[in-house]
């Protein structure tokens, strides 16, 4: 098949491109390199089935060839306020790619009679009052808080896809991605796993917000890519699927695991209270994905962390 991956030079997108090439597909990787990196896709450039197009999908453009599937992953995703690549630093670009970019990819999918995959996020649940979160849960969200740039633009992207499915018979599906980690993450991404691993390897303190008892789930990237492909191949038109690892850990537990794996002398440093809008608990209910997609994570947190540490050393 001929497959388009937007955001293909990013963390998840580059892994997805690699997996699709392994499966023998032709891949058109589209990225404006605002937050993605050509280094992430360098290994694919010698593959005759791989084509890279530097393009902002928020702006009008055309894909001349036929297309069977479109994976729309393009969007800044880093919450690191100190990074120039975060959604805080790129508020309007973030909102545009998840609104006009999603609209445009839906139009292209219709014109090409292609399936569309929209990569949404667990952030649409906000600071959830339901635990674990099912796809039917509508969230506890802020429309104007500091995280709303990302959260609300993804919610609107979901609305666009749902409207195209209902009104124009688009073959689209929506996936809500929970915390994912692994090789090719930017070192300044700001999400807790990469921040703790780099701190542990450098012998620096683990910066913990609040008391560290807030919980997260962590999915290794290879599991997530398998889930993404399963959602495209087996997911039903108009459906939403949670993808993530349902095992839950406190931030303090994560710090101790990383300290042990890195052999670090680092200690926890409680730096600030929880940031505004930061959820106390976040964990997916993946019952639907297990039943409908025949998918569930296989890589344990310990195994995944060891892989990431080995990659970074």
Where are these regions (language model features)?
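N-terminal Rossmann-like NAD(P)+-binding domain of SDR-like oxidoreductases, especially those catalyzing
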Residues: 1-180, 222, 307
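Amphipathic alpha-helical segment in the mid-to-C-terminal domain
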Residues: 149, 189, 221, 251, ...
